[in-house]
Amino acid sequence: AVSGGGKSARYLISGNVLDQQAVTILSKYSRYGIRANIDADVRRWLQLSTKISGAIMHQDGSAPNWHHILNYSPTMELKDPETGVYNKDPYNMLSNNPYGALAESDNDSYSYNLNANMVLRFNIYDGLTLNVQGGYNFDYAPSYAFSSSKVASGATSSMSNKASVYQYWQNTNNLSYANTFNRHSISANAVWEMSKSVTTNMSISGSGLNNESVGYWDVSNATVRSESNSYTQSSLMSGIVRLNYDYDKPYFFTAALRADG
């Protein structure tokens, strides 16, 4: 991390790297992240604050089924020596061999994430300020999966590619006033806020692969194929007005109005 600045501007930049093997075979997790914070007094009447962070994550492999692992016979023959197909437990479990499920599959999940936030504070007049805040979130998450027919006798090979994109925008404008005149104290707020989110999803999958060497690539290699996609959007606008009046502390009056749409 690096930080510094002076009286009118300050900054912080940091990064992190994580790359580790998981406790199960053929699985690991990696993450690379960066973050930057900047605060500045641009003018006597204007302050700025910015926060930006980004991360890339990769998960290789899938989680094991511990119920199957703990109940499978520890001394059984792991797989057929002639075909290379993993055997099922003839005594304790009917499910597929948990070791074979990990060894004969390939799963990769990714996430590319960006978060950004900025606040502008305008000191318009004595007691009167305007805060303008904007935020943006972005996440792209593709994933890929492959399972071999060698997982178990009679198993069908399969593959899938999936991807989702999430975006969110938000803007908040807050005009506030506060002052005291003799025994009278007045404060008022007017807030206007807008937000919108969009999510898209796409997926293709196939089973009965003619050539397992390509793994989760080339859906045309599958005997049976399917695809799907979806789109979701939502938005919200809100307005709030609030007035507070205080006379000599014991007497207090407040009124508020809010509308959403």
Question: Which sequence ranges carry the predicted segments?
Answer:
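Short, flexible loop/turn motifs enriched in small residues
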Residues: A9, Q233-S238, Y245-K249
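Transmembrane beta-strand segments that form the barrel wall of outer-membrane beta-barrel proteins
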Residues: G15-Q21, F253-G261
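Transmembrane beta-strand segments of Gram-negative outer membrane beta-barrel proteins
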Residues: S8-G15
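Surface-exposed loop/interface segments of Gram-negative outer-membrane beta-barrel transport/assembly proteins
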Residues: A1, A22-Y29, G33-N115, N131-S238
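Outer-membrane beta-barrel channels and translocator barrels
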Residues: G6-K7, R43-Q47, N123-Y125, T180-N182, ...
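Exposed, low-structure sequence patches enriched in small/polar residues
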Residues: R242-D246, F253-A256
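Long hydrophobic segments that form regular secondary structure
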Residues: S3, R121-D126, L243
